[in-house]
A protein has these predicted regions:
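Helical scaffold of the NTase/Pol beta-like nucleotidyltransferase catalytic core
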Residues: 1-43, 167
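Short, flexible turn/loop "capping" segments at secondary-structure junctions
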Residues: 4-8, 52-56, 120
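Short histidine-centered catalytic/ligand-binding loop motif
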Residues: 9-18, 64-66, 126-130
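Active-site nucleotide-donor binding segment shared across nucleotidyl transfer reactions
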Residues: 31-59, 65-69
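A structural signal for short, well-ordered beta-strand segments
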Residues: 46, 61, 110-114
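Short amphipathic alpha-helices in soluble, non-transmembrane regions
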Residues: 73-81
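Conserved catalytic core of two-metal-ion nucleotidyltransferases
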Residues: 82-118
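Catalytic cores of NTP-dependent nucleotidyl/adenyl transfer enzymes across multiple folds
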Residues: 112, 118-178
Length: 178
């Protein structure tokens, strides 16, 4: 995971990198090996999965599992440690969040949902909509840059500032899929 990651709490936007999908594939392979049979689907989501827009250099991975309680027990007993840490406080998206950290940097966020959870489904819909609507992707990038300039030192406000736009895009994606 060369040159990917940020120190926890730091906010930085970087240009899109062609190797994000390769880095995701490496992570996917590792996670499938660790969680043998506990993953029903795994996807690259978040801004690094949207072609040609600036993003935080952290790979977002969405895992869906049929048995969330078993997944959590397994993670906390067998996986959590120096490299993988679980965010104990609830997330804004309601997911079970695992951080992968190496060399003092968060390299990936692993968002885990029960299979079929709407938050997981809409994360994929958002990614797909943005990749097929380049004009919206550029608007999203412009919003991210504007929020970054305003909230460089406040990652939470930066994230909250994107919420309304993300919800609008998800609504468009849902309507388009009907």
């Amino acid at each position: 995971m060369d040159n990917v990651g940020l120190k926890r709490g730091v906010l930085e936007l970087m240009d899109y990198r062609e190797d994000y999908s390769e880095i995701y594939e490496e992570e996917k392979k590792e996670l499938l090996q660790i969680y043998k049979g506990r993953i029903s689907s795994i996807d690259h989501v978040g801004s690094t999965s949207i072609k040609n827009i600036k993003s935080k250099p952290i790979i977002d991975i969405l895992i869906q599992t049929d048995d969330l309680e078993d997944f959590i027990r397994f993670t906390e007993s067998n996986v959590e440690g120096e490299t993988y840490t679980v965010k104990k406080e609830p997330t804004m998206g309601g997911d079970y969040l695992i951080r992968k950290e190496e060399d003092g940097k968060v390299k990936s966020f692993i968002h885990v949902y029960k299979t079929g959870d709407m938050n997981g489904i809409t994360s994929i819909m958002f990614r797909d909509y943005m990749n097929s609507h380049k004009d919206e992707a550029k608007r999203y990038e412009e919003l991210k840059i504007e929020l970054y300039e305003k909230y460089k030192d406040n990652r939470k406000e930066y994230t909250l500032g994107k919420d309304k736009y993300i919800k609008e895009i998800i609504d468009k994606a849902i309507k388009e899929s009907l």
